[in-house]
């Protein structure tokens, strides 16, 4: 099974910069771009996504946590959580509107997910508990944390690792 390479566009500067960086640095890498639409994005966010689509020459998939509802996804889940707003202690917004739609989008395919978190940011970022998703943080000085390395090197991940190493070897042999 072919490894999918995906990159999420949040609407912020870091994910946009990462998309541009990856296109310039790895022009032959077939990256799928996606965004998780909460229904509460600013018009400027949608404009950024459109501008990136034009620059990248690819459609950015719009993932919505609630497909068959007259409400936008945020309002839908706000009602489900009894009007309780998300916070750093209750991250239902991140889980329901971003992580779950992303994991549904990639399914069980082997995936390398590129995440635009800088090395100076004091947060881990998304590291999936699903064995088929490997998160990589190209803007970090230390790209992989210890738990990611341990996860990546498990025997159950051998086929995914073999495919990644083959793709790196092909790139190295072609002089990139």
Task: Give short role names for the model-derived ranges.
Residues 1-176:
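Nucleotide-activated chemistry modules centered on ATP-dependent adenylation/adenylyltransferase
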């Amino acid at each position: 099974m072919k490894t999918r390479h995906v990159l999420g566009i949040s609407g912020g500067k870091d994910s946009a910069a990462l998309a541009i960086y990856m296109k310039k640095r790895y022009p032959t890498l077939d990256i799928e771009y996606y965004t998780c639409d909460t229904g509460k994005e600013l018009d400027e966010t949608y404009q950024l996504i459109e501008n990136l689509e034009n620059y990248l020459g690819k459609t950015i998939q719009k993932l919505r946590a609630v497909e068959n509802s007259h409400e936008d996804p945020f309002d839908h889940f706000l009602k489900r959580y009894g009007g309780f707003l998300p916070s750093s202690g209750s991250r239902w917004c991140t889980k329901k509107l971003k992580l779950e739609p992303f994991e549904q989008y990639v399914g069980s395919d082997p995936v390398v997910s590129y995440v635009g978190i800088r090395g100076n940011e004091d947060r881990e970022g998304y590291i999936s508990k699903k064995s088929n998703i490997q998160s990589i943080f190209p803007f970090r000085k230390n790209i992989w944390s210890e738990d990611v390395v341990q996860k990546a090197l498990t025997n159950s991940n051998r086929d995914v690792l073999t495919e990644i190493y083959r793709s790196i070897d092909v790139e190295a042999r072609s002089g990139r």
